[in-house]
Amino acid sequence: MMYLSTAINVLYKEGLTPCYKIKDSTDPDKWGKVPTKSDDTWNAVTCDWKANGYRLPTDAEWEWAARGGENYKYAGSDDIDDVAWYAKYEYEYDKGTREVKRKKPNGYVLYDMSGNVWEWCWDWWRENIPSDTPAAGVPSGSLRSLRGGSWCNYDNICSVDSRGIKAPSEGGNITGFRVVRSCD
């Protein structure tokens, strides 16, 4: 909870409003212990889309950012070696994450949106997303959407349109996150 409390304090210091609530509170000290497995209370977290604090991107926001205003297969290039850390061969599964900004950025100067680590998105997973889905994504589920692929995936999994899934309680060395803020 120390990290969450520190993050919330930074938000307040910057004059920002926290986006997430658990048990109708933005105070992490009132959220309870971070669960090690699926937990109904933590799975019921809500997001205040009008708040100006940091949050996970939606699936659609992530893809828009990854595309960088361009139409490449990967975030910044059609050649994956320009922009991503990934598994070219089976024996590369043990390479691990890499330092950011060692590859070319995309058109919005965002680095490592293809490969390196899967990035959590706010959305609950749904195989096919209907066109009338709200901007905030699918409202409920048991698995969250991941984007970008990781260092242990082959190139086809690291494209900007590829999606993965994971339970919110799962971690590991192939997942990370990128935060966004809504702008007025």
Residue ranges and their predicted role:
Residues E70-N71, D78, Y93-G96, M113-D184:
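Surface-exposed recognition segments
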Residues A60-E63, A84, R178:
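Active-site phosphate/pyrophosphate-handling residues
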Residues N52, D78-D81:
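Structured loop/turn residues at beta-strand edges in well-structured enzyme cores
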Residues M1-E70, E90-Y111, C183:
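Short aromatic-cysteine micro-motif
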Residues A84, L110, N156:
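Short acidic, gly/pro-rich beta-turn/loop elements at beta-sheet edges
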Residues Y3-V10, R67-G68, D79, W85-Y89, ...:
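Glycine-rich, acidic and aromatic/proline-enriched surface loops and short helix-turn segments
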Residues K73, D82-W85, E99-R102, S145:
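Conserved beta-strand positions that form and line the central face of beta-propeller blades
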Residues A87, R102-K104, S162-I165:
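Short, well-ordered turn and helix-capping elements at secondary-structure junctions
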